[in-house]
Each structure stands twice: as structure tokens, then as C-alpha cells.
Amino acid sequence: MANQTASYVVVALCLLVLVAEHAEARQPRLVPAIFVFGDSTVDVGNNNFLGGTRKEGRANFPQYGVDFPTSKPTGRFSNGFNTADRLAQLLGFPMSPPAYLSLTRRTIRSQMFKGINFASGGSGLGDHTGRLVVGEVISMTLQVETFATVVEHMYQSAGSKRTASFLSRSIFFISTGSNDMFEYSFSRSNDRKFLAGLVASYKYYLKALYHLGARKFSIVSIPPLGCTPSQRLRRLEQMGTQGCFDPLNDLSLESYPLLAAMLEELAHELPGMAYSLGDAYTMVSFVFANPQTNDWSFTELEAACCGEGPFGASGCNQTVPLCGNRDNHLFWDANHPTQAVSGIAAQTLFVGNQTFVNPINVLQLANM
């Protein structure tokens, strides 16, 4: 029975990949705009414009962007497109909306009714997350506050009624929390308190966005961070059978039901709120268990494509050699997925079943 269930999930996921690729090729816009918040998994270049961000918090140099259409680094922590890009494409856009800090006062006003990306690599749910590691980041507090100024411009331009209608039909895509967990994992002072605080912070920001007009939320939970190349270098006695850092994976796994419960409660509390929660832990675990299917073939699940040293976990830059085939690597650098994985993640968020996305997928969310 277990084998039959696994086979069914493999077939279902392969089918959804085919459906999503077909949709991407011919789909008109399903929503008026997409607004993106979060960390380096969805940053498209905001950190390029922060003077106090160290190199660890930037991706505006080779080899980043080698597979982007321009073959140039953009600030995405990827060899090409990231998950925000791929999801935006499935919703009918060319790619993620541009980074807020790349816009001028004039272009903000022309772009705001198409969508804007506020995400910042290194940031998290805590106001101080990322500062010790990468220096200056745009915290979630500042991301939401910046969006609030954009909403003011919308009201001035289109009036309150049209703006409220526009925002209620747009998608708000959020991927955050991993950096908070990375930093906390070195102390492990009180797991229960940490996770409760993490989810409470998430709830605070969601309510703030709701009161600014957001209604449709696409949220990605925290993946098994202990399996990233950077974390495979930690204490060997705490490594699991797959060579992953189990204490960090345990935290990631424990965070999901808390996040799911909070979202369910919040949707009952806030009239008109709808959400789609992607279970990133289950998604990544599924790929680990099924590295080769009819639609993908990952032959390297541990080492980064761009980097040197054990697991390629050090220094993705123009001096290090790249792997020969980016599409068969799970990880691009020490902490981020390849474009190939980001595409699978976005497709799963878009049309996945409740094994991976709850209570509805993003396509259903967009059509509400």
C-alpha cells in the first residue's frame, strides 16, 4: 500500500508539472498584480542597492545569473530565475515584478498596479535577523512599511474603492523564516518559545498586510534547512542518515503545523482572507526520495553547483568552477536551490494537491 501511495504521488506530481508548463506557455494574467515579500529565496535585486550589505548578502556578481536570459547577475540568489519568477510566470507575468529599490519615484507609480518585489536576502521575521551575517537588510517590518507607502500612492492615483478592489484580487507571495531559523539553531535556547515567536511575528505581518488591503496570500513554509550544503558541514554526530543536520530539520518540520494552525485561525478571524500554504518540507523531501522521474533528473542532491570545498559550501563567485549541468543539481550555492528546483516548487505551489499545498493551490486562490 505504501508503494502504491508513493507511486500515485509521483504520477500526480509529474502530471501537475506538465499541466503547469502548458499553462505557462499560453496563459493570460490570472490576477492584476503580484507583490512579493521575504528573503533571498525571492529577492530579485533589492540588496544590490543597500550600501551596508556585505558580499554574503548580495548576488550581483558572477556566477550568479549564468542561466538568466541575459546571462548576467541580477541580484537573484540563483543561476537563473527564482521561485517568485516562476510563480509569476504561471500567473501570466514575464517574471517577478521588479525590486522596489530599482524603481524611481516615477517608475514606482507606473509599476505599482502591476506588482513590486520587496524581498531582501538575509532578512527574516525578526527585525535584527541577518544583520550579523550580511549587514544591512530590509526587514519584514520595513518591507511592509514600504508597501504601505505604495498603497498611499495607489489611493492618490486611483481612489480608495478602485485600490481596495485591485489589492483584494492581487496575490501576495511570501517566503521567509529560514534565516531566523539558521541563526537560532546555533543557540537552541528554547525551541518552543522560538517557534511560537516566529509564528506570532508571521501573524503580525499578515494582519498588517490585510489591513493595507491584501486578501489573497501565497505562503511558503520553511524547507528542510539542515540538508543545505552549508549545514552539512556541521557536527557529524548530529547528522542524520541522509547526511543532513537533523536538529535544524527538526525545527523546520515542527514549524509547519504551527504555521498552518495560525493561518487557519487567521482566515476565520479576518473576513475575506484566503491563503495557500505550500509545504516546502514535504516538497523537498519528496524530491530527495524521488530524485529521478519522467520530468526531472537530479543526480546531485548534496553539493552546490557553484562553490568550492566540501559540498561546494564556500564562495560562489566568478573564480570557482561551475558544475557541468545545473539542471541535475538540487542546490545552486550553499543555501539556495537551482533554477530547476525553483521551477518545480512554483509549479507545485500553482497546481499541487493537498499533499503539498493547503487548503487550496495558487491557481485556485487566483480564481477565487
Predicted regions and their residues:
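Conserved active-site regions of diverse hydrolases
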Residues: 2-368
